[in-house]
């Protein structure tokens, strides 16, 4: 078991250094977990860099830390998104899905529709249903909501049942968050019920319909 000693005078700087200087996978995970737990904006660049590392444990801790920091993360992460590192992009998609910032709308739509990883498509579909529309003007929100509705309708026909399941969850969240779309989504779920063959997805559709009554 690795032990990480951190000076209390400036723990953020010390933990950033610990992340950068970690000489084992275990030390890296521990340092990232400790840094993420501080919930300090100064940690955003380092936590973003960790998403590029080939260390899933550290990446999960970084994702959790970035989500906890909320919308303050979005501008930096969008600007520094590594389009050539698939792993980093996949982890970043999970961050955006967890934060719910509509500034990441285009990225989430693209991920939900096109990403080759079912886990990324699933995360993006769930995230699309939980965007914070209050951050947009009414006109912007209406346009974005229509985009999300169309995207989730498409993703609800994905070849992988786990992605379809996530799309149903996304549609339910969208309906509960946007009253004007509730009837449309209810009818869409009714139509999807007639097309779905997977029992677990059918059960999720049924539960969503119950929540929208």
What are these regions (language model features)?
Residues 130-134, 147-151, 155-157:
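Conserved binding-pocket/active-site segment within a compact domain
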Residues 115-116, 158-161, 195-196:
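Short coil/turn segments at helix-helix junctions and helix-capping linkers
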């Amino acid at each position: 078991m690795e032990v990480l000693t951190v000076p209390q005078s400036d723990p953020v700087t010390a933990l950033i250094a610990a992340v950068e200087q970690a000489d084992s996978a275990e030390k890296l995970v521990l340092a990232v977990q400790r840094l993420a737990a501080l919930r300090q904006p100064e940690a955003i660049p380092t936590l973003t860099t960790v998403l590029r590392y080939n260390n899933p444990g550290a990446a999960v801790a970084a994702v959790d830390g970035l989500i906890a920091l909320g919308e303050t993360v979005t501008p930096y992460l969008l600007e520094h998104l590594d389009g050539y590192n698939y792993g980093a992009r996949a982890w970043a998609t999970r961050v955006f899905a967890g934060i719910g910032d509509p500034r990441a709308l285009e990225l989430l739509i693209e991920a939900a529709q096109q990403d080759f990883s079912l886990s990324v498509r699933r995360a993006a579909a769930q995230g699309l249903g939980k965007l914070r529309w209050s951050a947009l003007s009414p006109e912007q929100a209406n346009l974005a909501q229509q985009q999300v509705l169309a995207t989730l309708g498409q993703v609800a026909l994905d070849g992988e049942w786990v992605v379809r399941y996530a799309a149903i969850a996304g549609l339910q969240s969208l309906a509960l968050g946007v009253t004007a779309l509730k009837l449309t989504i209810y009818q869409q779920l009714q139509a999807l019920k007639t097309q779905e063959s997977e029992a677990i997805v059918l059960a999720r559709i049924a539960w969503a319909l119950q929540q929208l009554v």
